[in-house]
Protein backbone atom coordinates (compact mmCIF):
# COMPACT_ATOMS: atom_id res chain seq x y z
CA UNK A 1 0.00 0.00 0.00
CA UNK A 2 1.26 3.47 -0.87
CA UNK A 3 0.61 5.17 2.45
CA UNK A 4 0.60 8.72 1.11
CA UNK A 5 -1.87 7.88 -1.68
CA UNK A 6 -4.16 6.10 0.79
CA UNK A 7 -4.21 9.13 3.10
CA UNK A 8 -4.62 11.77 0.40
CA UNK A 9 -6.58 10.04 -2.36
CA UNK A 10 -7.98 6.98 -0.61
CA UNK A 11 -9.94 6.53 2.59
CA UNK A 12 -8.17 9.38 4.40
CA UNK A 13 -6.77 7.14 7.12
CA UNK A 14 -4.52 4.12 7.42
CA UNK A 15 -4.21 1.52 10.16
CA UNK A 16 -0.59 0.84 10.97
CA UNK A 17 0.91 -1.38 13.68
CA UNK A 18 3.02 0.06 16.49
CA UNK A 19 6.61 -0.81 15.55
CA UNK A 20 8.21 -0.50 18.98
CA UNK A 21 5.60 -1.89 21.36
CA UNK A 22 8.03 -1.90 24.30
CA UNK A 23 8.50 1.88 23.99
CA UNK A 24 4.77 2.41 23.44
CA UNK A 25 4.01 0.49 26.66
CA UNK A 26 6.55 2.73 28.43
CA UNK A 27 4.69 5.73 26.97
CA UNK A 28 1.41 4.35 28.32
CA UNK A 29 2.93 3.70 31.75
CA UNK A 30 4.41 7.21 31.83
CA UNK A 31 1.01 8.62 30.87
CA UNK A 32 -0.64 6.72 33.73
CA UNK A 33 2.07 7.92 36.12
CA UNK A 34 1.73 11.58 35.05
CA UNK A 35 -2.06 11.47 35.41
CA UNK A 36 -1.41 10.80 39.11
CA UNK A 37 -4.84 9.31 39.81
CA UNK A 38 -4.10 5.67 40.60
CA UNK A 39 -2.34 4.20 43.61
CA UNK A 40 1.23 2.94 43.51
CA UNK A 41 0.03 -0.67 43.59
CA UNK A 42 -2.52 -0.15 40.79
CA UNK A 43 -0.69 1.94 38.19
CA UNK A 44 -2.31 0.62 35.04
CA UNK A 45 -4.47 2.10 32.32
CA UNK A 46 -7.56 0.04 33.18
CA UNK A 47 -7.61 1.42 36.74
CA UNK A 48 -7.18 4.95 35.38
CA UNK A 49 -10.08 4.45 32.94
CA UNK A 50 -12.41 3.26 35.70
CA UNK A 51 -11.45 6.12 38.02
CA UNK A 52 -11.80 8.74 35.27
CA UNK A 53 -15.29 7.52 34.35
CA UNK A 54 -16.42 8.71 37.80
CA UNK A 55 -14.43 11.96 37.99
CA UNK A 56 -15.91 15.44 37.75
CA UNK A 57 -14.85 17.77 34.94
CA UNK A 58 -12.71 19.73 37.44
CA UNK A 59 -10.91 16.55 38.52
CA UNK A 60 -10.29 15.55 34.90
CA UNK A 61 -8.96 19.04 34.22
CA UNK A 62 -6.50 18.72 37.14
CA UNK A 63 -5.28 15.41 35.72
CA UNK A 64 -4.87 17.01 32.29
CA UNK A 65 -2.78 19.77 33.89
CA UNK A 66 -0.57 17.04 35.37
CA UNK A 67 0.08 15.88 31.79
CA UNK A 68 1.82 19.19 31.04
CA UNK A 69 4.89 17.68 32.69
CA UNK A 70 4.96 14.89 30.08
CA UNK A 71 7.21 16.82 27.70
CA UNK A 72 8.63 13.80 25.88
CA UNK A 73 5.27 12.27 24.88
CA UNK A 74 5.60 13.42 21.25
CA UNK A 75 9.12 11.98 21.00
CA UNK A 76 8.01 8.67 22.47
CA UNK A 77 5.07 8.47 20.05
CA UNK A 78 7.33 9.16 17.07
CA UNK A 79 9.90 6.64 18.25
CA UNK A 80 7.15 4.04 18.68
CA UNK A 81 6.47 4.26 14.91
CA UNK A 82 9.72 5.60 13.40
CA UNK A 83 9.43 4.21 9.87
CA UNK A 84 5.80 5.35 9.58
CA UNK A 85 6.74 8.89 10.63
CA UNK A 86 9.77 8.95 8.33
CA UNK A 87 7.67 7.69 5.40
CA UNK A 88 5.14 10.47 5.91
CA UNK A 89 7.35 13.33 7.07
CA UNK A 90 10.97 12.64 6.23
CA UNK A 91 13.82 12.84 8.73
CA UNK A 92 13.51 16.49 9.76
CA UNK A 93 10.56 17.04 12.08
CA UNK A 94 9.05 19.96 13.92
CA UNK A 95 7.10 18.46 16.82
CA UNK A 96 5.16 19.84 19.74
CA UNK A 97 6.87 19.60 23.11
CA UNK A 98 3.53 18.71 24.66
CA UNK A 99 1.38 16.36 22.62
CA UNK A 100 -2.27 17.27 22.12
CA UNK A 101 -4.19 14.94 24.42
CA UNK A 102 -7.95 14.53 24.72
CA UNK A 103 -9.58 12.20 27.20
CA UNK A 104 -12.76 10.42 26.17
CA UNK A 105 -15.06 9.73 29.13
CA UNK A 106 -18.58 8.28 29.18
CA UNK A 107 -21.67 10.43 29.44
CA UNK A 108 -24.15 12.31 27.29
CA UNK A 109 -22.23 15.57 27.55
CA UNK A 110 -19.15 13.96 25.99
CA UNK A 111 -19.08 13.39 22.24
CA UNK A 112 -17.55 10.18 20.94
CA UNK A 113 -16.19 12.17 18.02
CA UNK A 114 -14.30 14.68 20.19
CA UNK A 115 -11.05 12.66 20.42
CA UNK A 116 -10.87 12.58 16.63
CA UNK A 117 -11.81 16.17 15.78
CA UNK A 118 -8.27 17.18 14.84
CA UNK A 119 -8.41 14.88 11.83
CA UNK A 120 -11.00 17.11 10.19
CA UNK A 121 -9.98 20.51 11.54
CA UNK A 122 -7.80 21.46 8.59
CA UNK A 123 -4.72 22.15 10.73
CA UNK A 124 -2.48 22.01 7.69
CA UNK A 125 -2.33 19.97 4.51
CA UNK A 126 1.08 18.82 5.77
CA UNK A 127 -0.08 17.62 9.19
CA UNK A 128 -0.65 13.97 10.06
CA UNK A 129 -2.41 12.76 13.18
CA UNK A 130 -1.09 9.66 14.93
CA UNK A 131 -3.84 8.18 17.07
CA UNK A 132 -3.22 5.19 19.29
CA UNK A 133 -5.38 3.94 22.17
CA UNK A 134 -3.56 3.49 25.45
CA UNK A 135 -5.85 0.58 26.33
CA UNK A 136 -6.86 -2.63 24.62
CA UNK A 137 -9.82 -2.29 22.30
CA UNK A 138 -11.93 -5.36 22.94
CA UNK A 139 -14.64 -4.69 20.36
CA UNK A 140 -15.47 -2.16 17.67
CA UNK A 141 -17.61 0.01 19.97
CA UNK A 142 -14.90 2.56 20.75
CA UNK A 143 -13.02 2.85 17.49
CA UNK A 144 -14.44 3.64 14.12
CA UNK A 145 -13.30 5.27 10.91
CA UNK A 146 -15.16 7.52 8.52
CA UNK A 147 -14.13 7.09 4.92
CA UNK A 148 -12.81 10.37 3.51
CA UNK A 149 -15.13 10.38 0.48
CA UNK A 150 -18.18 9.65 2.65
CA UNK A 151 -17.19 12.37 5.15
CA UNK A 152 -17.04 14.96 2.36
CA UNK A 153 -20.73 14.29 1.68
CA UNK A 154 -21.76 14.97 5.29
Regions found by a protein language model. Give the residues of each.
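Non-heme Fe(II)-dependent double-stranded beta-helix
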Residues: 1-11, 16-115, 121
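Catalytic core of non-heme Fe(II) oxygenases with the double-stranded beta-helix
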Residues: 109-154
